[in-house]
């Protein structure tokens, strides 16, 4: 019996409408739905005593309901346990979520019948070093964004690949992205689209004050080192997957490289990357008319 853990976003799932559909579908198909006690109580189950911290350990597969932000948050919970994650899209775009909210029942049936594949997505490890000491470290599915702080001043970032100086970027910052993250902030900043099953690292400047500055791509075995120039007297920010933020200052070093951990993502629909890309971008354009 397949045990399916559920991570809902209550802000996007009003009155837990789609979470209810998901739980009912799992039971109908002969699986076991696992939710934390707070959610279970709102669904009418007064006997559940499952702590949120234990859901991943108790599950074979995880399902989250929300947008890409919800998926990224859930991924941080599941990847360390090696559990595959499926996203149900309740947001507007949802590049990471594979299932439409109106197709939940069919998706559950495919899960229970073992009719799915698992993509192993490349991730990044990033550390922040100050005065020779690591002050923060994190794992990345989409991107690391080094950006100016609240004060609107140019940020100067010295960028190295394997300790070889690459360039000095004056501007609003720099995005270091995985192929999975190529459809996110990097794309908005003019970065390239990359198929998610390719292992490489993308670096995209944010509003660079240069005539020649463009994104660049390097192989996944390289180490990207970014030094916040000492002349940057104001603080800057390092944001990881839009989830965690760290303040940095002049002289701090951000080191990013390929992680040994890969993110297992459930795939059901069989569409290739370009089919999904065309559909998502086109649908959003149509909805804005």
UniProtKB/Swiss-Prot annotation:
GO terms for cellular component: cytoplasm. It is found in: Cytoplasm. It holds the Pfam family NAD_kinase_C. It catalyses: NAD(+) + ATP = ADP + NADP(+) + H(+). One of its GO terms (biological process) is NAD metabolic process. Coiled coil: none annotated. NAD(+) binds at residues 68-69, 73, 142-143, 153, 172, 183-188, 243. Belongs to the NAD kinase family. HAMAP family: NAD_kinase. This is NAD kinase. It comes from Acetivibrio thermocellus (strain ATCC 27405 / DSM 1237 / JCM 9322 / NBRC 103400 / NCIMB 10682 / NRRL B-4536 / VPI 7372). The lineage of its organism: Bacteria, Bacillati, Bacillota, Clostridia, Eubacteriales. The gene is nadK.
């Amino acid at each position: 019996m397949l045990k399916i853990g559920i991570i809902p976003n209550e802000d996007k799932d009003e009155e837990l409408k789609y979470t209810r559909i998901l739980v009912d579908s799992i039971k109908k198909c002969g699986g076991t739905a696992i939710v934390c006690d707070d959610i279970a109580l709102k669904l009418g189950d007064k006997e559940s005593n499952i702590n949120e911290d234990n859901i991943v350990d108790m599950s074979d597969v995880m399902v989250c309901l929300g947008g890409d932000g919800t998926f990224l948050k859930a991924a941080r919970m599941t990847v360390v346990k090696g559990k595959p994650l499926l996203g149900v899209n309740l947001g507007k775009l949802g590049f990471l979520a594979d299932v439409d909210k109106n197709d939940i029942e069919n998706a559950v049936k495919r899960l229970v019948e073992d009719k799915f594949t698992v993509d192993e997505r490349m991730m990044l490890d990033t550390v922040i070093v100050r005065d020779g000491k690591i002050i923060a470290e994190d794992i990345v599915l989409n991107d690391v964004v080094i950006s100016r702080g609240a004060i609107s001043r140019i940020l100067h970032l010295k960028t190295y690949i394997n300790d070889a100086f690459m360039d000095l970027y004056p501007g609003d910052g720099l995005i270091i992205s995985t192929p999975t993250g190529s459809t996110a902030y990097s794309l908005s900043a003019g970065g390239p689209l990359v198929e998610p099953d390719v292992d490489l690292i993308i670096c995209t400047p944010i509003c660079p004050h240069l005539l020649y500055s463009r994104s660049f791509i390097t192989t996944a075995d390289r180490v990207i080192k970014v030094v916040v120039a000492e002349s940057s007297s104001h603080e800057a920010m390092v944001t990881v997957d839009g989830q965690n933020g760290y303040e940095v200052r002049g002289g701090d070093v951000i080191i990013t490289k390929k992680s040994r951990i890969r993110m297992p993502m459930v795939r059901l629909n069989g569409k290739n990357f370009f089919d999904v890309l065309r559909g998502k971008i086109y649908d959003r354009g149509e909805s804005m008319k």
